[in-house]
Design a protein with these regions (language model features):
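Mobile "lid/hinge" segments at catalytic clefts and subdomain interfaces of large enzymes
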Residues: 118, 123-180
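Small-residue-enriched alpha-helical segments and adjacent helix-cap loops
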Residues: 1-134
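Intrinsically disordered, low-complexity regions enriched in small/polar residues
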Residues: 35, 56, 145, 190-193
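Extended hydrophobic packing segments that form well-structured cores
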Residues: 157-210
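Short acidic (Asp/Glu) and glycine-rich catalytic loops that position anionic groups and cofactors
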Residues: 26-31, 61-70, 144-156, 171, ...
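Alpha-helix boundary/capping detector
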Residues: 94, 136, 200-204
Length: 210
């Protein structure tokens, strides 16, 4: 579910499908859910309208994604956030498609960190940045290398506040390194532990053209 945006109509359709197939819905902390069902129900669920509505988001950039409410719903928010997270995921899936991988991208619209960006593989903190003309614009600070599965570790700050379009380019270059150097089925978290964590921030910045 892209950034957890799931309205009442969607929930009604899903609940009817769960009842029809005698399935169980399990929510995740990454603003999505799993459908637990029997084998004979799989095709029926995959052919349902509600499944098809969200099927295009089933890729590594949406599967483990968190984004807090953002400026439209929260007085502390600096950027829209959810829309920015969705735009980033769509951009990356177009330019750096990866199938055998896992990457946790968490977005917080302000330094308070409700999107838990500090433990993300790649975290984003909403900020005011400068565009290429020097004008103020929505932006993010990017963090990398947070740990939240096998261990817990705070992410390192990779960039100062940069515009959203610039952030897309930066993350694309970072994930290009991941795609070309990762092991089969290696998660970004494991890749960071094996490769990126032994590099200084300056070395990583140089590799991605910052």
């Amino acid at each position: 579910i892209p950034t957890g945006i799931f309205n009442a109509e969607n929930l009604k359709d899903l609940s009817l499908l769960m009842k029809k197939t005698d399935s169980i819905l399990r929510l995740t902390h990454e603003q999505s859910f799993f459908i637990i069902t029997n084998d004979e129900n799989v095709d029926l669920i995959k052919n349902s309208t509600i499944y098809k509505k969200f099927d295009s988001f089933h890729n590594i950039y949406f599967n483990n994604q968190i984004a807090c409410a953002g400026v439209n719903e929260c007085s502390f928010g600096v950027i829209p956030n959810k829309a920015d997270a969705i735009e980033m995921a769509l951009y990356l899936n177009t330019h750096i498609p990866i199938s055998d991988a896992k990457i946790r991208m968490y977005w917080s619209a302000c330094p308070k960190g409700c999107g838990v960006h500090g433990v993300a593989d790649i975290g984003f903190e909403g900020a005011i940045a400068k565009d290429e003309n020097g004008s103020s614009c929505n932006g993010v600070k990017i963090f990398i290398g947070g740990k939240a599965t096998k261990s817990v570790l705070e992410a390192r700050q990779l960039t100062k506040a940069i515009s959203i379009p610039k952030a897309q380019e930066v993350v694309k270059e970072l994930l290009n390194i991941y795609k070309t150097q990762k092991l089969e089925n290696e998660s970004f978290e494991s890749f960071d532990s094996r490769i990126l964590s032994i590099l200084s921030i300056e070395e990583i910045q140089n590799r991605i053209g910052l």
